[in-house]
A protein has these predicted regions:
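Short beta-strand/loop motif that positions the catalytic acidic residue
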Residues: 104-107, 111
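Short, proline-enriched alpha-helix->beta-strand connector loops that line the catalytic pocket
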Residues: 49, 98-103, 129-132
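C-terminal catalytic histidine-bearing segment of alpha/beta-hydrolase fold enzymes
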Residues: 117-164
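Serine-hydrolase catalytic machinery in alpha/beta-hydrolase-like enzymes
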Residues: 1-52
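Short aromatic-enriched loop/helix-cap "lid" or pocket-rim segments at secondary-structure transitions
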Residues: 1-5, 91-92, 147-150
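A structural signal for isolated positions on well-ordered beta-strands in alpha/beta enzyme cores
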Residues: 52, 78, 102-104, 134-136
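Primarily recognizes the serine-hydrolase "nucleophile elbow" in alpha/beta-hydrolase
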Residues: 47-98
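A short beta-to-alpha transition loop/helix N-cap that caps and shapes the active-site region
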Residues: 1-2, 84-89, 113
Length: 164
């Protein structure tokens, strides 16, 4: 996908459509690293209920994948310009701890990297499982939009509330 060049990534992209072939082993290895990071923060005194797992692009994919399988309740999930990987496994692997955790999803209408249809399909898959999803689209490519930043701020204020 990257012309054969090595670059940092959460997992390998095996095809241009992102989902017909997926690097399950790489996704699961990154999931373990994220779970370990969350455990480290909890051990430092941050309650899991005060953590929002967020990511952009592949980070979005990892935030969705990991949070929905996590046995600790999180404050929220923020999924920006990405998609739900290994969606066909979610029903079997989903943990109920985050079944009602709010998900903020945002995507650019002109995204050439992760086309908006991929994000919409992910949104629809989550909604079909009863996951509360707040969807936003913005006139942008694979990037951030000023209005998106404002919407993110409002979401974080809602799910985190006042500082403890």
């Amino acid at each position: 996908v990257n012309g054969g060049y090595v670059m940092p990534a959460w997992y390998d992209i095996l095809g241009p459509d992102l989902v017909s072939q997926q690097d399950a082993a790489g996704i699961q290895a990154s999931e373990r690293a994220i779970v370990a990071l969350i455990a480290q923060e909890v051990a430092r005194g941050i309650p899991a209920e005060r953590i929002v797992l967020a990511g952009f692009s592949q980070g979005c994919a990892m935030a969705l994948h990991t949070a929905l399988r996590l046995p600790q309740k999180l404050a929220g999930i923020m999924a920006l310009s990405g998609y739900l990987p290994l969606a066909d496994r979610l029903t079997a692997e989903r943990h109920p701890a985050n079944g009602s955790t709010p998900v903020f999803m945002a995507h650019g209408t002109q995204d050439p990297v992760v086309v908006i249809a991929r994000g919409e399909a992910s949104r629809d898959a989550l909604a079909a499982l009863g996951q509360p999803v707040e969807w936003h689209s913005y006139p942008m490519p694979h990037s951030l939009h000023p209005r998106e930043i404002s919407d993110i701020s409002a979401f974080l204020a809602r799910v985190l509330g006042p500082a403890a």
